[in-house]
Amino acid sequence: MEKEQITQLLEKQRQYFYSGATLNLDFRISALKRLHASIQKHEAQIHAALRKDLGKSNFESYMCETGLVLSEITHMLKHIRSYTKEETVPTPLAQFHSRSFRKPSPYGVVLIMSPWNYPFLLTIEPLVDAIAAGNTAILKPSAYSPATSEVIRLLIHECFDPKYVSVVTG
């Protein structure tokens, strides 16, 4: 992907984030459910790619990569409402007439660059957290695990609009 294409992608994601579409909690939950279903659907392809890139068995691929990601998504779906809830915190004495609170809010566009050794886990697990937080994301899987990078690209393309989540390979 050329520099100009990446710049355009980044701008589209910023525009999408600023539209407020990712702030809706039901939107985030729906995105996480789609990702969970897609991972389950393509689990055999993911394991085959991990075998090709790293020589991992199906058992190791599940225990160290896909199983952990599916578990993270399940955990996030269970707790997302409490993680995104506004929280009252103690007010400093100087502002006694005020109310203090902490409100979790997304950053915007998140870049997730992953290493070669756990290419699926270390790409998708941070994505789960970015989606749950209400961000858009650009994923850059390692060039040293090309088969897994391609499966991730196909999986993300199937689940999400590029203005929401995109994959840059190479």
Task: Give the role of each language-model region.
Residues 93-170:
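Rossmann-like NAD(P) dinucleotide-binding subdomain of oxidoreductase/dehydrogenase enzymes
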Residues 1-101:
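N-terminal Rossmann-like NAD(P)+-binding subdomain of aldehyde/semialdehyde dehydrogenases
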